[in-house]
Amino acid sequence: MLRIINTQINMSTDWILRVGDGENLRRSSKYKIWGIQTITSPHGKHFIKNVKHGDRLWFVKSKSQGLVLAVATYVSHNKREFGPLLNITMTNEELGWTGDGIDWTSDIEVHYTDLYNLTQCQLLTHIKGASTIRKYDDKCKVELPVEYNYILRYSKITLEL
């Protein structure tokens, strides 16, 4: 039984998601929802096509040498739906998100669980580039899969950031 569980953990993919200054993530963390753009972002499209249940989502602050704010476990995603009379999904206002511009608006909700607040850990990925979502690779200065094992061992799941 232990061998099967260990195999499942090792098959998880680590995804790095840039979250601006982190304030929108902090405000919506109580709902366990993050938003991504797939209409104009090839990185968002790639993520939606390849992410799977149990993958790890590393939320990283922009323009901070890649400061890791939190890690969570991916559960699912869905298209955000707003109607003239009734909204099927939560609005930006309900989630506490602020911002403007077409590139800012998220068309997909990403649902996660097991959120760990890492704001005090000073984990710096040092990843550069314009990509808002990417798979973990050797360009990352922190071995995220190794760190995740320590996080599981020494941290507690948080209800929100």
Question: Where do the protein language model's features map onto the residues?
Answer:
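Short coil-to-beta transition motif at edge beta-strands of beta-rich domains
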Residues: I48-K61
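Dinucleotide-binding Rossmann-like beta1-alpha1 core, especially the glycine-rich loop
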Residues: K30
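Short catalytic/ligand-binding loop motif for oxyanion handling, primarily in non-cytosolic enzymes
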Residues: G66-V68, E81-F82
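Short, flexible beta-strand-to-coil junctions
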Residues: V19-E23, V60-Q65
